[in-house]
Amino acid sequence: MDSPFRTIGLIGKPNHPDAAATLQRLHTFLLALGFTVIVEKRTGSQLIDIPKNKLVKLVDLGEQADLAIVVGGDGNMLGAARVLARFDIAVIGVNRGNLGFLTDLNPEGFEASLEQVLSGEYVEEKRFLLEVEVYRHNELKSANSAVNEAVLHADKVAHMIEFEAFINNDFVFSQRSDGLIVSTPTGSTAYSLSGGGPILTPELNAIALVPMFPHTLSSRPLVVDADNEVRLKLSLENTDSLQVSCDSHVVLAVLPGDEVVIKKADKKLRLIHPKNYSYYNVLRQKLNWGSRLY
């Protein structure tokens, strides 16, 4: 097959029999088309007849492959994407989860759509990530990245915290609330949406600041240019049990008086879709919007 891809990496949902079956089928399908296939190590433990030299760490997969195929739900895609965004690698997903905003391909009969993608007939989007840093006494203590959102919150349910928010060092607001969601357009259909945040289409260079149960009736979500730097300064009156969650996967500890800096990361995720992909069609299907009236 004449393809822009040569080496394809497979990443799967751990301990999921249906995902494992799809991966096995996918592996056989790609080998039959003549591609070099490598498999993420944890994923490979679920499959049979995978040569040991084709089992690699996720970072090595990002370095060696031209295309990564993630089999699972959006959570699996997020975990892989935070690592793969560091590399010049295209990523596509086969949905073995629930909603599947980021995983386009249907596990039943994915072959036809995937073969079109492999022949070069696809739509590519570049999704930016957030870089999250925690500073204590002006010293960087921890950092990570997020594809969907960074969430400042207490580690207790229904526990109020106090903080100030700055945009490019301009004071914006102080708040007593359960926390704050800082979302990318990719994450605007995830936790942010559940918190009352706006849907941001993927091409927008914007981030949304969504308060979580604020102790005021005037607090509303705020959308700002993604090239701005968001800084959250924690009040000294807070308890010690605070944290910043990145995509609900990585947790950074935060203490009273710390500052959390959130900004657009330099690297972007190369997310690809079948040629007939429509973002609005995905919204309509996943969110059960009404069909056309005429």
Swiss-Prot record:
NAD(+) binds at residues 74-75, 148-149, 159, 176, 178, 189-194. Its cofactor is a divalent metal cation. InterPro entries: ATP-NAD_kinase_N, ATP-NAD_kinase_PpnK-typ_C, NAD/diacylglycerol_kinase_sf, NADK. Keywords: ATP-binding, Cytoplasm, Kinase, NAD, NADP, Nucleotide-binding, Transferase. Involved in the regulation of the intracellular balance of NAD and NADP, and is a key enzyme in the biosynthesis of NADP. Catalyzes specifically the phosphorylation on 2'-hydroxyl of the adenosine moiety of NAD to yield NADP. PANTHER family: NAD KINASE. This is NAD kinase. It comes from Pseudoalteromonas translucida (strain TAC 125).
